[in-house]
Amino acid sequence: KHTKLGLDACNDDCCQRYQGISNISKSSIKAARNTRGKILMYKNTICDTRYSKSCGGRTEKGDNVWEIDYKPYLESTSDSDYNDETNLSDEQSFEKWLTEQSLSFCGPKFIEEKNLSKYLGNVDEKGKYHRWEVCYSNDELIKIIFDKTGKQFSKISKIVPKKRGASGRILHLDVLGKKINGKEFSLSIKSEYEIRKIAGIAISLTVPHLFNKFCW
């Protein structure tokens, strides 16, 4: 992947932050040896497998996250041993689920936050990893949207999730506010991929009431 740099893998997100052979565990070696030479197939075609080093409690359908065709094997599923059938596309159900104690594999009941450095290494910032908050001022969010879309707000009054996927991640988002001339203005973003590309943040969290800042 990084042949021009003389590397097989880097320690950043594009290679899932490879941390070198000094951090290889016995379980990782065992898993690699047990699956050597094996590939996942679906209808005589190699599967388009995806990986993430973290989870929010539930995965999203592949075609909602990436610009790919629908894959029957990339459906939404629970990130835990507990088969949670909660309908997270419903706004109230999602907010309740988000504030409850998570049973997912990367939640604090499975991995205590004090032990995170063992798994994250020295690359990631210390702090909340499974449930966390990011805040932007009105001006900061206006600049982010302008830089990514060229759409100019003078003020953003509200962010409205119009549709959520099976994981609760927003698939359709409306940004409401005013233009510089004072007229009402709105921006509609109609895919989870586009929302991430524009906002540059994880958007699988509740959009709050506005108190001079937007927090996720």
Please place each PLM-identified region on the residue numbering:
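Conserved, single-site charged/polar hotspot
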Residues: K1-W216
